[in-house]
């Protein structure tokens, strides 16, 4: 007697998770308002736990639709000088992975309507295993999604699986140098949204963005089943306006906000004012 061999179920996509649905709802609210979603970035633990909590809440209150929280790391390869300085400052002030998640949990409880997306690196979030414990810890803290800056879909399958178990989305990145066919593949694997890097290089506020950014946004959006959010170099209302009008679903701003906090990292009023100006420029 022979028995039928059942088909092996395909791994669950992280875009079907509860976290991805929360992210989708945030993008949908912005779209219903005729604008792109604004996604400010803060570094967990910079200048210290209290200061970063204040900055996060101020960014949300000034108009954030989602919030990206960077987990401080000793070797942040994708970060420019501003974010490296903030990350080093957070570590010097005693920030750890655990304290960063405690901070995220506090933000999620204080401002529950705005999804939090954590950003880190593979050594932090996966290490030598599959990242299951870290994914569970992120979910327990209230994180909706996670960006692993140096993880590609080619190597990300095991982490996607444990993230799906934990109900959080795994957000991937594409760059101007990513080949068109690969952009489509990465977009198909990304959960929550797709992070479109606007320029070649590391993060950091720029006075201008590449003239090709609008074309890049249109091309990436055309092949992405999830919302496309554009980051790197976005620091001015004119940048936000141009990216929104090119059709991006979301706009990420990071270094400019850390700069706005001033030398001591505590000028929350200036950060709030900048977020409000950027939010006002998100209309399509």
Spans of features found by a protein language model:
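N-terminal amphipathic alpha-helix/helix-capping segment at the start of soluble metabolic enzymes
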Residues: 1-39, 104-109, 218, 283
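Hydrophobic faces of well-ordered beta-strands that scaffold small-molecule active sites
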Residues: 38-42, 67-69, 116-120, 146-148, ...
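Conserved, mostly hydrophobic/aromatic
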Residues: 40, 59, 67-70, 138, ...
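Glycine-rich phosphate-binding active-site loops on the catalytic face of alpha/beta enzymes
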Residues: 64-76, 143-155, 196-204, 233, ...
């Amino acid at each position: 007697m022979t028995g039928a061999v059942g088909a092996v179920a395909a791994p669950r996509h992280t875009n079907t998770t509860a976290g991805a649905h929360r992210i989708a709802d945030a993008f949908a609210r912005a779209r219903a308002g005729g604008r792109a979603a604004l996604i400010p970035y803060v570094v967990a633990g910079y200048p210290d736990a209290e200061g970063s909590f204040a900055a996060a809440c101020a960014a949300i209150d000034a108009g954030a639709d989602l919030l990206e929280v960077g987990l401080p790391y000793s070797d942040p390869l994708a970060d420019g000088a501003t974010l490296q300085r903030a990350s080093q400052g957070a570590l010097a002030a005693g920030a750890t992975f655990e304290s960063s998640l405690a901070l995220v949990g506090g933000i999620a409880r204080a401002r529950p309507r705005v999804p939090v997306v954590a950003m880190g690196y593979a050594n932090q979030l996966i290490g030598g295993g599959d990242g299951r414990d870290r994914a569970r810890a992120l979910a327990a803290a209230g994180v909706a999604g996670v960006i692993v800056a140096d993880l590609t879909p080619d190597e990300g399958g095991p982490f996607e699986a444990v993230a799906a178990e934990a109900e959080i989305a795994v957000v991937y990145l594409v760059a101007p140098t990513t080949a068109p066919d690969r952009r489509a593949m990465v977009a198909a694997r990304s959960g929550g949204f797709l992070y479109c890097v606007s320029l070649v290089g590391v993060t950091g506020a720029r006075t201008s963005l590449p003239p090709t950014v609008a074309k890049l946004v249109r091309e990436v959006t055309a092949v992405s089943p999830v919302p496309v959010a554009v980051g790197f170099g976005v620091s001015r209302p004119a940048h936000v306006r141009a990216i929104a009008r090119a059709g991006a679903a979301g706009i990420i701003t990071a270094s400019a906000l850390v700069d706005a906090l001033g030398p001591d990292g505590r000028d929350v009023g200036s950060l709030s004012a900048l977020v409000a100006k950027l939010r006002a420029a998100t209309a399509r």
